[in-house]
């Protein structure tokens, strides 16, 4: 038997003993969860997410729609310089007005590239960096 089954059984026993649901035993919980806008992977179509400016335009549209945050999935194949420029352009346009997040979806090929992107995210005030390498 795995440890998770034992853990669940112990929580069940504790809930029955205290006559309370487990979520109350664990502490606070949310009744609302904030949503954020998330892009698809960029492309090279003229009307798509084909440039840093196109990503920034879309971020502005999302901000106008009331989204408090914006997550970027960038181009699968592009130079590191272009990708970091994307982070800068979006941050210049909407940074400070909404949280910015980046999910490279394991598209960075080296630890060094991931480190450079992490530093850029820090420099431009990104809220999180997800799955870089």
What residue ranges belong to the model's regions?
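N-terminal capping/lid subdomain adjacent to the active-site entrance of alpha/beta enzymes
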Residues: 1-101, 105-123
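A conserved nucleotide-sugar
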Residues: 126
